[in-house]
Amino acid sequence: MSIFRAMKAKIGIITTWFERGAAHVSKAIIDVIKDDFEVYIYARGGEVAANHPSAWTHEHLHWGTTLPYAMKTHVDLPDFKKWLKNTTPDVLLFNEQHSWEVILWLKENSRIPIGAYIDYYTDDSREHFALYDFLICNTRRHKMAFQDHPNAWYIPWGADLSLFSPKKKEVQKKALTFFHNAGMNPYRKGSDLVIQAFASMKEKDCKLIIHAQVGPDVLEATIRHMLDDERITWIQEEVPAPGLYHLGDVYVYPSRLDGIGLSLPEALACGLPAIVPNEGPMNEFVFDGLNGKWVDVARRWKREDGYFWPMNEVKVSALAEAMDEIALDKGQLSLWKDRGISFTQKHLNWHKNAAGLSALLQGVKSNAASAKALDACKNYQGALNPKLTLKMKLHRFLVKIGARKLKRMFTQA
């Protein structure tokens, strides 16, 4: 074998890079392709740096330039071009990229294959994902939304079972502990529903632990007052994987909307049966009576930003009933734990599910985009927030003028 054949291909991943779900997805992808690819990370500018630097270091990590007035996930093109020139990647993967300028530039100026990890898309933006040469879909409903794309890969999400695993069996505690992960957005995660349901349960000999990256002040006052219950603990802390799942017996996750719901496979892998809405993607990981319980959705509505999938909400009374059912039947809980662990090992092993990802990435080709598709995306991007776009252009112009003045000053000196 020649030395050239033995060299690894290079992949550039453009992503959030700190204690957030998107970054954990990027780390999981890196973990399964690192033996086949030399990985370069472009951490988008303007996003928070990691509070746990030991968990967020990387050999080839570049923090992108921050621009004022930039929309979420904006990539500064001058900085990106320099990074691209220095790294010379063979393929690029964008993780939760909402801004389209960099995609448009690549399709018009480069032959590097580009792909997207699918999470956020609206009714209006979905068609523009045709500009990508490949898509990574980790849930069935994402795959369904992009079934017309010729390279939409369905790679079922899971968990790193070497990191997320059940604790050794202990003597059954008297008080059952429900665990809920509120993340950065307690409303979207259904934290208010969990607190109300817990307060209205018939079984009172139980506890509730809520782990969040924000404080309870984000809750409405009526919900916040319920936290005075000494049985409820709110933990505000950024905790690296495997998190705090080991503190609970049952995972309660009435999420109103999720792209994947990363915490579900993690909780299940840690041996916690889960209570979730009977709604995708939550019901792709939890099966009623097998490794948890479904709660019927009471209402659905469209989110203001036009996200493709609707919000959903369960009734507090129905959620409380499901929590009571588990709390009052310890035998069923034990059965669900055992079944859940078995199901997770068989179906939610991320390394097994993503074993073929490297081969797919190595075989991808760049496809030329039509002028019509490029123009449509340009019009969409321009309409997202024209005022911010104008401010960004003005800022870049002023920076350039300032740099010229400084250069003249030093030259004259």
Language-model features and meaning:
Residues 273-276, 286, 293-294:
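Short hydrophobic beta-strand element within catalytic cores of glycosyltransferases
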Residues 256:
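Aromatic "clamp/platform" in nucleotide-sugar-dependent glycosyltransferases that forms part
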Residues 313-314, 318, 328-361:
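A charged, aromatic-enriched C-terminal amphipathic alpha-helix characteristic of glycosyltransferases
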Residues 219-238:
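Nucleotide-activated donor-binding/catalytic signature segment of Leloir-type glycosyltransferases, i.e.
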Residues 126-127, 158-174:
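Acidic anion/phosphate-binding donor-loop and adjacent secondary structure
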Residues 14, 170-189, 195-199, 209:
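Conserved donor-binding/catalytic core segment of Leloir-type glycosyltransferases
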Residues 133-165:
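Donor nucleotide-sugar binding/catalytic pocket of nucleotide-sugar-dependent glycosyltransferases
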Residues 129, 237-238, 243-248:
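Short alpha-helical donor nucleotide-sugar binding micro-motif in glycosyltransferases
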